[in-house]
Regions:
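Bacterial N-terminal signal peptides
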Residues: 1-10
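Beta-strand-enriched cores of mature, soluble protein domains
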Residues: 14-151
């Protein structure tokens, strides 16, 4: 009987943290880097039915010849004004192709650490991979993961 009571109690908490799937793809050339650190994206990510209308972040890198690690901190502003905060790590590897062109591939892991409004208790993990062309300042990425709202 004690075991049944423990299971009943723990199952209620599990339902309170329903997890949601996340997937986002930025086709090649839709993200641009500039001196003003503005980003243009084709398809906007969606969280709980709301689109991200702006993503501002800081990336601190330790690259040598385009390869190395970086830390990212981002504030995503949703279409209703709510915000989602993230912290991530990036590992980049730059190689030179047979045509002499430099190509940088990367993988990333991002933690959703909190938010405002309806996203105040958001938590989650996203994994991404993609490429960057530092000469043209373009990037493409595929990101997947899951998030939930803690009660």
């Amino acid at each position: 009987m004690l075991m049944a009571a423990c299971l009943a109690f723990s199952s209620g908490e599990a339902f309170a943290q329903q997890k949601h799937k996340f997937s986002f793809k930025a086709p090649p050339g839709t993200t641009k880097f500039s001196q003003t650190h503005l980003m243009e994206v084709g398809e906007a990510p969606v969280y709980d039915g709301l689109k991200v209308v702006e993503a501002r972040g800081v990336l601190v890198s330790d690259y040598v010849d385009g390869s190395g690690n970086a830390m990212t901190y981002t504030v995503n502003t949703m279409e209703n004004g709510d915000k989602i905060f993230t912290r991530g790590t990036v590992m980049a590897l730059t190689s030179i192709g047979s045509d002499g062109a430099r190509r940088t591939s990367f993988t990333s892991v991002v933690a959703l650490t909190g938010g405002t409004g309806k996203f105040i208790g958001i938590r989650g993990a996203l994994r991404g991979s993609g490429f960057s062309d530092m000469k043209t300042g373009t990037s493409g990425t595929q990101t997947e993961g899951e998030y939930w709202l803690e009660k």
